[in-house]
Amino acid sequence: MRVNGSAKLVCKTRVKEVSPDGEPILVEPMGNFTVIKDLVTDMDSFWSKMKSIDPYVKTDFEPEAEHIASNESMTHLLGVMNCIMCGACVSECTAMEVDPTFTGPAALAKAYRFVADPRDEETNSRLGDLNKSTGVWDCTRCLACVEVCPKDVAPMER
Protein backbone atom coordinates (compact mmCIF):
# COMPACT_ATOMS: atom_id res chain seq x y z
CA MET A 1 0.00 0.00 0.00
CA ARG A 2 0.96 3.62 -0.18
CA VAL A 3 1.21 5.57 3.05
CA ASN A 4 1.43 9.34 2.76
CA GLY A 5 2.29 9.00 -0.93
CA SER A 6 4.99 6.34 -0.70
CA ALA A 7 4.86 2.54 -0.99
CA LYS A 8 5.37 0.80 2.33
CA LEU A 9 4.81 -2.56 3.96
CA VAL A 10 1.91 -1.54 6.18
CA CYS A 11 2.40 -4.67 8.26
CA LYS A 12 5.82 -3.33 9.30
CA THR A 13 5.12 0.42 9.34
CA ARG A 14 4.60 2.06 12.71
CA VAL A 15 2.22 5.00 13.00
CA LYS A 16 4.90 6.97 14.89
CA GLU A 17 7.20 6.70 11.84
CA VAL A 18 4.72 8.22 9.39
CA SER A 19 2.93 10.58 11.77
CA PRO A 20 5.30 11.57 14.57
CA ASP A 21 3.18 14.55 15.62
CA GLY A 22 -0.21 12.91 15.15
CA GLU A 23 -0.96 14.42 11.76
CA PRO A 24 -3.47 12.61 9.50
CA ILE A 25 -2.20 9.56 7.62
CA LEU A 26 -3.23 8.93 4.03
CA VAL A 27 -3.45 5.23 3.10
CA GLU A 28 -3.95 4.42 -0.59
CA PRO A 29 -3.77 1.36 -2.84
CA MET A 30 -0.46 0.64 -4.55
CA GLY A 31 0.33 2.67 -7.64
CA ASN A 32 0.65 1.12 -11.11
CA PHE A 33 -1.87 -1.61 -10.27
CA THR A 34 -5.56 -1.77 -11.13
CA VAL A 35 -7.69 -1.20 -8.04
CA ILE A 36 -10.21 -3.98 -7.43
CA LYS A 37 -11.87 -2.41 -4.40
CA ASP A 38 -10.78 0.00 -1.68
CA LEU A 39 -7.11 -0.87 -1.01
CA VAL A 40 -7.13 -4.20 -2.88
CA THR A 41 -5.19 -4.21 -6.15
CA ASP A 42 -4.97 -6.71 -8.99
CA MET A 43 -1.47 -8.20 -8.98
CA ASP A 44 -1.98 -10.30 -12.14
CA SER A 45 0.23 -8.02 -14.26
CA PHE A 46 2.97 -8.25 -11.62
CA TRP A 47 2.92 -12.05 -11.66
CA SER A 48 2.67 -12.19 -15.47
CA LYS A 49 5.81 -10.09 -15.80
CA MET A 50 7.56 -12.22 -13.22
CA LYS A 51 6.62 -15.35 -15.14
CA SER A 52 7.70 -13.78 -18.45
CA ILE A 53 11.34 -13.62 -17.39
CA ASP A 54 11.30 -17.41 -16.87
CA PRO A 55 12.48 -17.37 -13.24
CA TYR A 56 14.14 -20.77 -13.14
CA VAL A 57 17.71 -21.99 -13.43
CA LYS A 58 18.04 -23.64 -16.84
CA THR A 59 20.71 -26.15 -17.72
CA ASP A 60 21.43 -28.24 -20.80
CA PHE A 61 21.82 -31.38 -18.74
CA GLU A 62 19.88 -33.35 -16.17
CA PRO A 63 21.94 -33.27 -12.96
CA GLU A 64 22.33 -36.56 -11.16
CA ALA A 65 22.15 -34.80 -7.81
CA GLU A 66 21.41 -31.33 -6.52
CA HIS A 67 23.26 -28.73 -8.63
CA ILE A 68 24.98 -26.76 -5.88
CA ALA A 69 26.88 -23.54 -6.52
CA SER A 70 29.71 -22.42 -4.29
CA ASN A 71 29.05 -19.72 -1.70
CA GLU A 72 31.62 -17.48 -3.38
CA SER A 73 29.82 -17.62 -6.71
CA MET A 74 26.46 -16.74 -5.15
CA THR A 75 27.23 -13.99 -2.61
CA HIS A 76 26.66 -11.22 -5.17
CA LEU A 77 23.08 -12.52 -5.54
CA LEU A 78 22.11 -12.21 -1.88
CA GLY A 79 20.48 -8.81 -2.38
CA VAL A 80 18.16 -9.88 -5.19
CA MET A 81 17.41 -13.18 -3.49
CA ASN A 82 16.01 -11.20 -0.53
CA CYS A 83 13.09 -9.90 -2.61
CA ILE A 84 9.76 -10.73 -0.95
CA MET A 85 7.66 -9.85 -4.04
CA CYS A 86 5.75 -7.13 -2.23
CA GLY A 87 5.46 -4.91 -5.31
CA ALA A 88 6.56 -1.69 -3.58
CA CYS A 89 9.13 -1.04 -6.30
CA VAL A 90 6.51 -1.49 -9.03
CA SER A 91 4.11 0.79 -7.16
CA GLU A 92 6.65 3.64 -7.28
CA CYS A 93 8.09 2.99 -10.76
CA THR A 94 7.79 6.15 -12.86
CA ALA A 95 8.55 4.25 -16.08
CA MET A 96 5.55 1.99 -15.46
CA GLU A 97 3.32 5.03 -15.01
CA VAL A 98 4.18 6.04 -18.57
CA ASP A 99 4.37 2.53 -20.09
CA PRO A 100 2.53 -0.25 -18.23
CA THR A 101 4.15 -2.82 -20.56
CA PHE A 102 7.60 -2.09 -19.08
CA THR A 103 8.96 -5.25 -17.44
CA GLY A 104 9.40 -3.36 -14.18
CA PRO A 105 11.94 -3.36 -11.36
CA ALA A 106 10.80 -6.51 -9.55
CA ALA A 107 10.93 -8.70 -12.66
CA LEU A 108 14.25 -7.14 -13.73
CA ALA A 109 15.76 -7.86 -10.31
CA LYS A 110 14.51 -11.43 -10.54
CA ALA A 111 15.92 -11.71 -14.07
CA TYR A 112 19.31 -10.53 -12.78
CA ARG A 113 19.16 -13.27 -10.17
CA PHE A 114 19.16 -15.88 -12.97
CA VAL A 115 21.40 -14.05 -15.45
CA ALA A 116 24.12 -13.86 -12.79
CA ASP A 117 23.62 -17.42 -11.47
CA PRO A 118 26.69 -19.47 -12.47
CA ARG A 119 24.54 -22.61 -12.90
CA ASP A 120 22.21 -21.05 -15.48
CA GLU A 121 23.06 -21.76 -19.13
CA GLU A 122 20.54 -19.38 -20.74
CA THR A 123 22.31 -16.11 -19.90
CA ASN A 124 22.67 -14.94 -23.52
CA SER A 125 19.05 -15.75 -24.30
CA ARG A 126 17.87 -13.99 -21.14
CA LEU A 127 19.96 -10.91 -21.90
CA GLY A 128 18.60 -10.86 -25.44
CA ASP A 129 15.04 -10.86 -24.11
CA LEU A 130 15.82 -8.12 -21.59
CA ASN A 131 17.41 -6.02 -24.34
CA LYS A 132 14.13 -5.86 -26.27
CA SER A 133 11.46 -3.18 -26.12
CA THR A 134 9.93 -2.91 -22.61
CA GLY A 135 13.12 -4.40 -21.11
CA VAL A 136 15.99 -2.80 -19.24
CA TRP A 137 16.28 0.21 -21.54
CA ASP A 138 12.84 1.49 -20.55
CA CYS A 139 14.07 2.14 -17.01
CA THR A 140 14.48 5.86 -16.35
CA ARG A 141 16.98 5.25 -13.52
CA CYS A 142 15.03 7.49 -11.16
CA LEU A 143 15.82 4.97 -8.37
CA ALA A 144 12.37 5.33 -6.77
CA CYS A 145 12.32 1.52 -6.57
CA VAL A 146 15.56 1.53 -4.57
CA GLU A 147 14.21 4.08 -2.09
CA VAL A 148 11.04 2.13 -1.23
CA CYS A 149 12.35 -1.45 -1.24
CA PRO A 150 11.86 -2.81 2.30
CA LYS A 151 14.54 -5.48 1.80
CA ASP A 152 17.23 -3.32 0.16
CA VAL A 153 17.13 -5.36 -3.04
CA ALA A 154 18.04 -2.21 -5.02
CA PRO A 155 16.68 -3.55 -8.31
CA MET A 156 18.12 -0.88 -10.56
CA GLU A 157 21.58 -0.98 -9.04
CA ARG A 158 22.22 -4.40 -10.57
What are the language-model segments listed below?
Residues 1-31:
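Hydrophobic/aromatic-rich structural module bridging two neighboring secondary-structure elements via a short loop
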Residues 26-33, 37-158:
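Ferredoxin-type iron-sulfur electron-transfer modules in oxidoreductases and energy-metabolism complexes
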